[in-house]
């Protein structure tokens, strides 16, 4: 398009897309955990291979994410991990929702499940005993994260999230009363519970420009791009709160270098954290300019003024006011003299670059039933307790969680690229590549919110990938629990009805 200086239309069929698109998730781990007799983690060792495909466009982003999340929300004083990035003749590996994190959580959660079984400790209790305490933060894990800076968890309060998920799913009641009754009726029902963390809001920076126009409308320009994450809603809310206007009075431009030169991008659950804080900072500066000018015009101290409904008004005398549009005009005098150093207009540009990311966390729990004949699953209940810091918009957050869980279900039990020994893709169509539909989703996702502020000004953390990260480990735990009388160990994801049938037959043949 740039060479021809004209729009280009690209068309490819589904098979071409399967062959030419990117892939992610394939890793092979050899992991060991050392625990005391009371279930305390003493050490974790892991060596793994990471399949990067034909070449490596993202460096070590994915395996570093895996290594950092392999410690989960737990205190692990002794940790070693060695990774080899392997080139194969498959599609290239790029970050996909979760981006190496689900694999790390899968490793530590599976090891804890095996330890709990060997020590005869309740699966919730063994996790509770190893969680990092609230006074441990900021917690430096002494390893390098995807940005090649120390992996520091800024804030956390993990035990209440675990307890809340266990309470919402009715963990103890199910295990002691419901599950024995259902099993006596011949039903294979299982329960799982999985804590997790998600590094979000990574650098290097984002910027924003906020301008009050003479119409009273607010223009915002930011370099971050958007692909449907409701940035327009969230960013408008951030500015509207600072400037005392309705979100409908805000016009937002994203990802246009003609409007704003500098930006990094939408990835790693960073939009609301990094760009959001840049917008907040710019809007705060503009708010200060508004109050300073209005104080002069209204002859009232700034601390006695308030911004509301597009007006600046005296707190105890609301009829004494001036509109933002009028102030914007006064801030841009066309004649006369101004004091040296005066900046025209009600406008500001600000940037935000975090020292380290904002680490979200949560706990998911699930009850499912396995059909012993077909190995099809039915999710009976699904609970997601999420802590993404200060929630800007609950509907946006819940939409992200729902979408993430849907993708996690696909990662856990349906979606897998099958290759033959020559690297030929065997299921390059939606007739053969399984994806979850509405029928495979839980009838209802019960969401519990917690709000542990992060260290940035807004107190926000990302949530775009949180729904996906714990799901594979959660499925493995719940399926094993459902098939309690078969004594299987699930060591891989994704599964499928066919693959689960094969695993059961492999166990029976031993």
Predicted regions and their residues:
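Cofactor-binding beta-sheet edge motifs in enzyme active sites
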Residues: 1-160, 167, 172-510
